[in-house]
């Protein structure tokens, strides 16, 4: 038997309705902030991610699904959404649109070769936003407010917004030099990943997950001590907007995020629900990227965005015991007696469905008792029984499956009955 590839999942009907509910809620909420949907290819040129995400990142070095197509071009299944959206912004010359910033959102599968663990898959679904074309602290604050709005709209609590400034390019350069000087004498004691990052991307050492290394990192210089005046002022304005909005936040000077393109504001939304056994899990993250467009041969525009995993959002809802308000039951189940009634039911179903009524019937020639059980299993709100007598008299009994009460109406008036 051929089985599903490791690190992937089948989303069966009982779960897919939860996905659809969440995606619909996200689509609706995001319109309040004037974001428009963009859809980019699932695969892109490998060079897009090598340049846009960063050659030295774990994503590019270890996690991408890369292959040669029949034209001998190097192609990669997208591991994240920002680079592709920025590529599209550049390619379609969106900087010429007077409606700046351009506010875009996306939703779709991403691919990373990661170790399988709870809430993480090698194919995962990511919802993200990008606001490109305005370097303004109020845009950063709006994006952070949107993050909180999304998760709170699903009833989640125990949320912690963690923020930091990684400064502009000049601040980052000075800070990276200080990190190299700090870590170089002891780097041989660190994990192999940290050793390889020392001269390629020293800030990523701060993101190391090895317990022994995390202890040593505590003595490292802090980015906040290397921010120039412009970066400091920008960060203070972002925090002032958050204060005005009444959004609590925690500052973490070691928060750098996993991708190379971040500048100024970086953030993560975390959750410390007691059901996680004291562990803190990251729900989503993002930040500002002021050099990414130029890095991809685009204009000197700036952007900010975030991405969240639908899988991790579902897991968080499950851990907090939150039931989604999903209404997908049938309006009507038609029970039939005899060939003539069964044939009529096919025509009736078509009429009902074209009038916005969710309806179904038996297809296995069950007896009446079996058909009623099927109606119950499907959660039908109402049932009707059609036989030769009902067809002759043009009368049917509409049974409320919740109360057990029935009402006799004309068969021709069934649509009007449900629309009243």
PLM features per residue range, with description:
Residues 1-420:
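TRNA-recognition modules of translation machinery and tRNA-sensing kinases, especially anticodon-binding
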